[in-house]
Amino acid sequence: MASKTKASEALKVVARCRPLSRKEEAAGHEQILTMDVKLGQVTLRNPRAALGELPKTFTFDAVYDASSKQADLYDETVRPLVDSVLQGFNGTVFAYGQTGTGKTYTMQGTWVEPEQRGVIPNAFEHIFTHISRSQNQQYLVRASYLEIYQEEIRDLVSKEPGKRLELKENPETGVYIKDLSSFVTKNVKEIEHVMNLGNQTRAVGSTHMNEVSSRSHAIFVITVECSERGSDGQDHIRVGKLNLVDLAGSERQNKAGPNTTGGTATQPTGGGGGGGGGGGGGERPKEASKINLSLSALGNVIAALSGNRSTHIPYRDSKLTRLLQDSLGGNAKTIMVATLGPASHSYDESLSTLRFANRAKNIKNKPRVNEDPKDTLLREFQEEIARLKAQLEKKGMLGKRLRRKSSRRKKAVSAPAGYPEGPVIEAWVAEEEDDNNNNHRPPQPILETALDKNMENYLQEQKERLEEEKAAIQDDRSLVSEEKKKLLEEKEKMLEDLRREQEATELLAAKYKAMESKLLIGGRNIMDHTNEQQKMLELKRQEIAEQKRREREMQQEMMLRDEETMELRGTYTSLQQEVEVKTKKLKKLYAKLQAVKAEIQDQHDEYIRVRQDLEEAQNEQTRELKLKYLIIENFIPPEEKNKIMNRLFLDCEEEQWKFQPLVPSGANSSQMKKRPTSAVGYKRPISQYARVAMAMGSHPRYRAENIMFLELDVSPPAVFEMEFSHDQDQDPRALHMERLMRLDSFLERPSTSKVRKSRSWCQSPQRPPPPTAHASLAASAALRPTTVLDHE
C-alpha cells in the first residue's frame, strides 16, 4: 500500500485571475475575487449575497493574481513538468475557465514581446535550450497540432485542415489519432512555424465577451525522443510526450452571444466553423452547445476520478476526454490552470470554475518513464542513417580503388630500374597507401568529408579523362569513320554512366545529411563555461521555486495547526471569559455551518440547472428524432428502409452508427460486377418487345421499351367571316348577346363520326398554304365589329 501511494501523484491545480477589462470598468462592475498568493487561496464574494453571508474560500497549489507575470507561472509551475518530459515522462498542461478569462493568453500569450510569451513558446525555448546543453545524447523532436471542433478532430497543419480524422485505440500504445501529421523540428524557429501555421486555420470567432474567442479545443503535441548510451554499452531510448491544451471557454448564450457588429465572426478550419458576421449567429449556438457538452463530459470524468465510490470513468462521452485519458488518472503528470474573471457579472461562472478546479485536486495519476518503446522514430532514424552511411563509405572506397588503379598505371610506367614490373609494383604501391592510411586515420566527421571530396575529385578526373579521349579520337585521322563513331559512342556511354553514378551519389549524400541534421546532438558548438553558468542559474531558479512552494505549504499547515491549538487551550480565568471565548467559537462554527448550507444549496441549484439543460437537450434530440421518423415513414419505401437497417452497425471505438459496405471487404474489388439478367449479352437492358422484334427481323434500335409512337394530326387554322347586323335601333346588349351566340354555335359544330389518326401538320401529305398578309388582315377585320354604336 505504501508503494502504491508513493507511485501516485496528485494532479497539480493553480488558479490565475485576469485584471478588469475596460469594458467592465466602464459598465461599473466591481471586483469580487481576492487572491492570497502566499497562502495559495482564492476568496470569492457573492455580490448578491444576503447580509452576514461569508465569502467562499478555495485553496490550490499556487495562485497568481492580476499582477503576475508569464515567466512566474512558467518557472514555478510548468518548468518542472517540462523537465520531467525531457526525462521520458508524459506531461499535460491545460487551461480551463469561462470564455474571455485569458486561457489562450496563458497558453500562447503574445509572441512578439518576450515578457508576454505564454506556456507554449516558453516550453519551446526550454526544450531546445536543454538539448543544446546536454552531453552525449541524441534527440528527435516532433510536433503535431490538432483541434476538436464540434466533436470532430481536425489536423491544423495538414494540407486538408477540414478533413475529419478518426480516433483509434491500441492496447499497447493507448489512444491515438489515425493519419495525424507530425513534423520533425530542429530548432525553435521551425516549431514556432508549425504553431503559427496551425493558428491560421484554427476556428475562432467574435462574441460579446471576447473579440477573438476560441471555438474549438486545440492540442499542441510535442514528442521528445532521447537516445543515450547506458552502462551496458547499448543505446537506450526515452520518449516523453507533452500535451499543451487550450480549451474553449464554457459560456452561456445570453452572455456570450454572437457579436454581429464585429465584422467577420469566424475563421473556420477548412469547410467548418461558420460564415461571416451574418452567419455567425446561426453557428454560435451550435458551437457553444458542443463546447459545453465536451466540458461537461470533462467535468463528469473529473468528478468520477475524484470520488472513491465510482467504478466507471466515462472517458468515451467525448473526444476530448478520450484524448486526455492518460492525463486524467493515467500515467502522465498533469497541471490544470483555472482562469478566472474578477468582475461581479461573472460570479456564477467563476464559482463553477473554482469548484471544478477544487474537485480536480483529488485526482491521482501514476506517472512512469517511457523507456525503450517499440515504435520510436529515433531508432528508425538511427538505423536508416547507419545504412546510408555504409552505402556512402562503400561508394567512397570504390572510388578510392578506382583512383588507385589509375595512379598505379602512372607509377608502373615510370618505375625505377631494379624493380619488377607489372602487378608487383601495383601491389607494393597499394600496400604502401594502405599503411599510410592506417597510420593517419582521420576522425569520423573528417573521414566523411574526405570520402565526399575523394569521390568528387575522382568523378571530375574521370570526366576530364573521357573528354580528352573523345577529343583525341576525333582528332585521330588514321581511324575509319565507322570505328571513330563506335569509339565515340562507347565514350559517350561511359560518360553518361559516370553522370548517373554522380547523381546517385549526390542524392544518397543529400539524404544522409538531411536525416542526420534532424537528429539533435547536445553539446556541439556550445561553450562549456556558458553551459555551466546557465545550468547553475537553472538550478538556482528551480530551488527558489521549490522553496516558495514549501513555504506556501508550511503556512497553510501552520494555519490549520493554529486553529487546532486554539481549540485545545481551555484555561480560563473566569466564567465570563469562558463564555466570551465559547460564544466567539460558537459564532465561528455557526458561520461555518451557514457556509456549508449555502454550499449545499448552491450545489443543489447547480444540479437543477444542469438537469434542466440536459432535459432541454434531450427534448431537442427527441424532436429531431420524431421529424426524421416522420420523413422515413412517409417518403422512404419499407423495402428500402429494411435494406438500410440491415446494413447499420455500431462502431464502439467512435460511438457512431455506420453502414456496412455493399461489397464485402474480402471479395476481389478488381473483379468486374456481373450485369443484370435482363441484359445478358447486350450493352444495355432490352425489353421483351424489342427481343421479339429482333427475332422477327425488324430493326430494334430505338425500341428499348414497349412504347407506341403515334403521329399527331393538327387541322389547319380555319378562317371564317361573321355577319353582324347594322341595325342602329337595336339594343346594344341584345346585339352583343347575338354575337356571342353565333360564336358559340360555330365553336360547337358537330365533329365527324369518323375517327382519324392524329397527324401533325408537318407530317400531313398536303400542307395548308401559309396565310398571306392580305388574308390575315381580312380575317382580323372580319373578327372586329364593323358597326359603331351611337348612343346620342
UniProtKB/Swiss-Prot annotation:
Organism: Bos taurus (Bovine)
Keyword Metal-binding found: no
Subunit note: Heterodimer of KIF3A and KIF3C.
Record-level GO cellular component terms: cytoplasm; mitotic spindle; nucleus; spindle microtubule
Domain Kinesin motor as annotated: residue spans: 10-363
Subcellular location per the Swiss-Prot or TrEMBL entry: Cytoplasm, Cytoskeleton
Biased composition (Basic residues): 397-412
Coiled coil: 374-627
SMART domains reported in the protein's UniProt record: KISc (SM00129)
UniProt keyword list: ATP-binding, Coiled coil, Cytoplasm, Cytoskeleton, Microtubule, Motor protein, Nucleotide-binding
Region feature Disordered, mapped onto this chain: 249-287, 397-418, 749-792
Function, as annotated: Microtubule-based anterograde translocator for membranous organelles.
UniProt KW Glycosyltransferase keyword: no
Pfam families attached to this UniProt entry: Kinesin
Region (Globular) location: 628-792
Compositionally skewed regions (Gly residues) per UniProt: 269-282
Family stated for the protein in its record: Belongs to the TRAFAC class myosin-kinesin ATPase superfamily. Kinesin family. Kinesin II subfamily.
Positions with biased composition (Low complexity): 257-268, 773-792
CDD domains: KISc_KIF3 (cd01371)
Sample GO molecular function, one term: microtubule binding
Residues that bind ATP: 97-104
This protein's name: Kinesin-like protein KIF3C
GO biological process: microtubule-based movement; mitotic spindle assembly; spindle elongation
